[in-house]
Curated annotation (Swiss-Prot):
Subunit structure: Homodimer. The dihydroxyacetone kinase complex is composed of a homodimer of DhaM, a homodimer of DhaK and the subunit DhaL.
Swiss-Prot/TrEMBL catalytic activity: dihydroxyacetone + phosphoenolpyruvate = dihydroxyacetone phosphate + pyruvate
Example of a GO MF term: glycerone kinase activity
EC number: 2.7.1.121
The protein's name in its UniProt record: PTS-dependent dihydroxyacetone kinase 2, dihydroxyacetone-binding subunit DhaK
Cysteine pairings via disulfide bonds: none
SUPFAM superfamilies listed in its UniProt record: DAK1/DegV-like
Leader peptide range in chain numbering: none
Pfam families for this protein: Dak1
Function: Dihydroxyacetone binding subunit of the dihydroxyacetone kinase, which is responsible for the phosphoenolpyruvate (PEP)-dependent phosphorylation of dihydroxyacetone via a phosphoryl group transfer from DhaL-ATP.
Binding-site positions, dihydroxyacetone: G55, S56, G57, H58, D111
This protein's encoding gene: dhaK-2
Length: 331
C-alpha cells in the first residue's frame, strides 16, 4: 500500500482533525459532533443553510467546500460509506437560522436513507429540511432519477449556495439546485482502483495497462474494459456520449469541469482539457469559466471525469457569484 496513514481505522478522524487544524480560518467541528464540519464564516443574517455530505475518500468533495457563501456544513461518513442519521440531524441543529436547510448529496441509497432520517428528526424539532439529489453520471442508469452523483456535485452545490447567499427562500434555493442538476452531465474513466487505508488493498481489481470508461467513483462498473488508449481517443469517446446525451448544438454555452480522481497528474488533466476545448470549439459551442483539477476524487484512483453544464444567464450568474472556501473560490 502506497499510503501515508497510521491506523487505517482512525484515518477519517485523523484526517478531520488535521483539516480543521489547517483550515481554522474557515471551519470548525460542530459543538456536539466531530463528523460535522461547520463554516466559521456563515452570514449573521438568517438565511437558508446549505448542508452537503457523504462518505470520506472523495476529498476535497464535501468538507472542502464549507466556507463563505458556499456550504454551511458538511456531514462526513466513513470511507465510501454514508454518514449515519445522527450527524445529518446534528448538522441541521448546528447551522439552522430559522429559514430552513437544504441537504445535497450524490444519489446513493445509503445517503438517501440516512439523510432522510436526519430530515425527519429535524422536522420533529420544527425545522424544515428539503433535499436535492445530484444525478449527473450519465452512464450509471438510463433513468435520470436513478443516476449517481459524481463531480457534478460541485456545480449543484454552488448553484444552491449562490441562491441562498442572495437571500432567496428555501423553495427558490431548492429550485436553483434542481435546475443546475438537470443541466449537469458527467462521465469518467478509471485507469486504476483506489486503495482502502484499512486493508491496504484495492477496492476492485484492474490489471496494469487497462482502463474502464464509465466507471463510478466507488468502482461501479463502466461500459467496458480495454487497453489504455491515448488521451485524445479517451476524451473523444467520453465527449461523444456527453454531447449525444445533451443534444448539444452550435451556439450553446457550457461550463466545463475536468476532474481528477486523485492519482492522475495535472499534466494529463490539461492534456484532456485541451482536447475538450478543441471538440467544443469545432462544434461551435462556447465555453464559460472552465475548471481543471481535483474536485471530487476517489482517494488514489488514477482517472478523470468530464462534466459539461448547459448554461443560461441564470446558471451563469449562480456559478459566478463570489464565494470563498479552502478548495473553491470565485472572486
Amino acid at each position: 500500500m502506497r499510503r501515508l496513514v497510521n491506523d487505517g481505522y482512525e484515518a477519517v478522524e485523523e484526517m478531520l482533525a488535521g483539516y480543521v487544524a489547517a483550515q481554522g480560518k474557515y471551519v470548525d467541528f460542530a459543538e456536539n459532533d466531530k463528523r460535522v464540519i461547520v463554516s466559521k464564516q456563515m452570514s449573521e443574517e438568517p438565511r437558508v443553510r446549505i448542508i452537503v455530505g457523504g462518505g470520506s475518500g472523495h476529498e476535497p468533495l464535501f468538507l472542502g467546500y464549507v466556507g463563505k457563501d458556499f456550504a454551511d456544513a458538511a456531514v462526513v461518513g466513513n470511507i465510501n460509506t454514508s454518514p449515519s442519521p445522527e450527524p445529518c440531524y446534528n448538522a441541521v441543529k448546528a447551522v439552522d437560522s430559522g429559514k430552513g436547510c437544504l441537504y445535497m448529496y450524490g444519489n446513493y441509497a445509503g445517503d438517501v436513507m440516512n439523510f432522510d432520517m436526519g430530515a425527519e428528526m429535524a422536522a420533529d424539532d420544527g425545522i424544515r429540511v428539503e433535499t436535492v439529489l445530484v444525478t449527473d453520471d450519465i452512464y450509471s442508469a438510463e433513468n435520470v432519477e436513478d443516476r449517481r452523483g459524481v463531480a457534478g456535485d460541485l456545480i449543484v452545490f454552488k448553484a444552491a449556495a449562490s441562491a441562498a447567499a442572495k437571500g432567496l427562500d428555501l423553495d427558490a434555493v431548492k429550485q436553483a439546485a434542481e435546475k443546475a442538476n438537470a443541466n449537469t452531465f458527467s462521465m469518467g474513466v478509471a485507469l486504476s482502483s483506489s486503495t482502502l487505508p484499512v486493508t491496504g488493498k484495492a477496492i476492485f481489481e484492474m490489471k496494469e495497462g487497462e482502463m474502464e470508461v464509465g466507471m463510478g467513483i466507488h468502482g461501479e462498473p463502466g461500459i467496458k474494459r480495454t487497453s489504455i488508449e491515448p488521451a485524445d481517443k479517451v476524451v473523444d469517446q467520453i465527449m461523444g456520449y456527453l454531447i449525444e446525451e445533451m443534444k448539444l448544438t452550435a451556439g450553446e454555452e457550457v461550463h466545463v469541469l475536468i476532474n481528477g480522481l486523485g492519482g492522475l497528474p495535472v499534466m494529463d488533466q490539461y492534456i484532456c482539457y485541451r482536447r475538450v476545448d478543441e471538440i467544443l470549439k469545432e462544434k461551435g459551442v462556447h465555453i464559460h469559466s472552465p475548471l481543471v483539477g481535483n474536485y471530487a476524487t476517489s482517494m488514489d484512483m488514477i482517472g478523470m471525469s468530464i462534466t459539461l453544464v448547459r448554461l443560461d444567464d441564470e446558471l451563469k450568474d449562480l456559478l459566478d457569484t463570489p464565494c470563498d472556501t479552502p478548495y473553491f473560490k470565485v472572486d
